[in-house]
From Swiss-Prot:
The protein's Enzyme Commission number: 6.3.4.4
Cellular compartments annotated: Cytoplasm
Role description: Plays an important role in the de novo pathway of purine nucleotide biosynthesis. Catalyzes the first committed step in the biosynthesis of AMP from IMP.
Active site: D14 (proton acceptor), H42 (proton donor)
Entries under InterPro entries matching the protein: Adenylosuccin_syn_GTP-bd, Adenylosuccin_syn_Lys_AS, Adenylosuccinate_synth_dom1, Adenylosuccinate_synth_dom2, Adenylosuccinate_synth_dom3, Adenylosuccinate_synthetase, P-loop_NTPase
NCBIfam families: PRK01117.1, purA
UniProt record similarity statement: Belongs to the adenylosuccinate synthetase family.
Protein name: Adenylosuccinate synthetase 1
Residues annotated to bind GTP: 13-19, 41-43, 312, 338-340, 421-423
Listed HAMAP family: Adenylosucc_synth
Endoplasmic reticulum in keyword set: no
Residues involved in substrate binding: A306, T307, T308, G309, R310, L311, R312
Amino acid sequence: MGKNVVVLGTQWGDEGKGKVVDLLTDKASLVVRYQGGHNAGHTLVIDGEKTVLHLIPSGVLRDNVKCVIGNGVVLSPEALMREIGMLEARGVPVRERLLISAACPLILPFHVALDVARETARGDKPIGTTGRGIGPAYEDKVARRGLRVGDLFNPELFAAKLEEVLEYHNFTLVNYYKVDAVDFQKTFDDAMAVADILKAMIVDVTELLDQTRLAGDNILFEGAQGTLLDIDHGTYPYVTSSNTTAGGVATGAGFGPLHLDYVLGIIKAYTTRVGSGPFPTELYDGLDKQDPVGKHLGDKGHEFGATTGRLRRTGWLDAVAMRRAVQINSISGFCLTKLDVLDGLETLKICTGYKLEDGTVTNVTPLAAEGYEKVTPIYEEMPGWSENTVGVTSLDGLPKAAIDYVKRIEELTGVPVDIISTGPDRVETMILRNPFA
């Protein structure tokens, strides 16, 4: 029998999921995106060549893999066509490998306009969205007024639905945010221009997944963003608009949760965050916080967002938050990424608890952003190492201090580290236990 594996982020995104998904897809038949949209940025480096994907699953560069976009993904036709064009220009036969659920909500120009207008109106207190219309598209889905991919194939129905929802949103754009209305005819024409292209890729995702499972083939589910950005379990309201946790697989792909065999949590050897929101172990943000260790992490780790290009805030590893990620996702094993970025640091710190305002200590995360902003991290110090770990592919090749750091993460979280990444390239990895084995 095959195995069904979930790969997801355990922090605030940017943990290195793209590389890991690409690495594991040599054993998978399907790679499935189940939430998010083109706000995700998954970077792959293969033989020195860099590819950044935002919407299409990271398995698209593999000949043996079909890539699936499930119903939980909000889909921008414009972004999809741009990504298809980029890959086809490099000789990748995307349309032969990509399958899409007709139930995917569409991201249309008025969603982007709303997203940008709202962030602008928040002034110096933005949520930190990518401005790509993700949140407004999910809002329309929940409000049951959104258009879906399947609507594109009935032009009359699409036009009627578009006219209704556009009237609703244009009223807000013009009268509340004082920006221009979105044009109906251009929105309609642009959508119809890609309808036939998308129609050729439509599939019943639930049926496909079940038949693949019954055939004994492996399925890999690729998460976007990270656990601490989950709409329900993250640092609300500084979160994304979807469920980034393992439960999102069932709802966002239509796959029964009892069929999941392994959840791989991607954990960076330190912590980063893009945009606004609490960050207890933060060291460096390029503005108010200027700790040299944090700058080292950002510079050596090339910490700039793959989607937005924004500087990522950096800080020490937070084991309290990691324990919560383990609880929510029932994580089977970790993939520890960017261990090499810690090379050269004399002392390392891991947050093992939070001190509250009244002086009490807890190892439980707060329920919302307001609680996070009031905690002080409690650190455990460990010796660092001076040796170079870039490209090391066996535990024996790591310095003792690095091995001790890995073991301490396992002890604090109760989860084994099954994969260690020591560089951006596919080959700069040690697999201690393969999730598909």
